[in-house]
């Protein structure tokens, strides 16, 4: 599998740590007039990213981050998700469909509907991690898989 693409973006100095993962939420009203907006807002909202490296020591002023922002290199993080066991094969290319379940107070709900993935995303099952940590309340046979867009 090809190495995931990397991007340079800006993140709050306090958050700029190699290995840190975050979900990019998109711009706020304060960002509209910022001269760094294009560099800060070059990620896709709702996606999970991991910081691979810090680029230099320069700190830029930011109205949202009291200690400013720094340039970092990021990549989209793989996601652990629960999937139908019958469709869980390492190396498979899939179109992601979350488990059809609306039991939002279930302890498995977040792993069945992981943040960072959207219905219809084209993904590769990098690895079948193992069995789901609990039985499904709806009776589905689930496996945990690592997915990469």
UniProtKB/Swiss-Prot annotation:
Coiled coil: none annotated. It comes from the Archaea. PANTHER family: UPF0179 PROTEIN MJ1627. Belongs to the UPF0179 family. This is UPF0179 protein Mthe_0220.
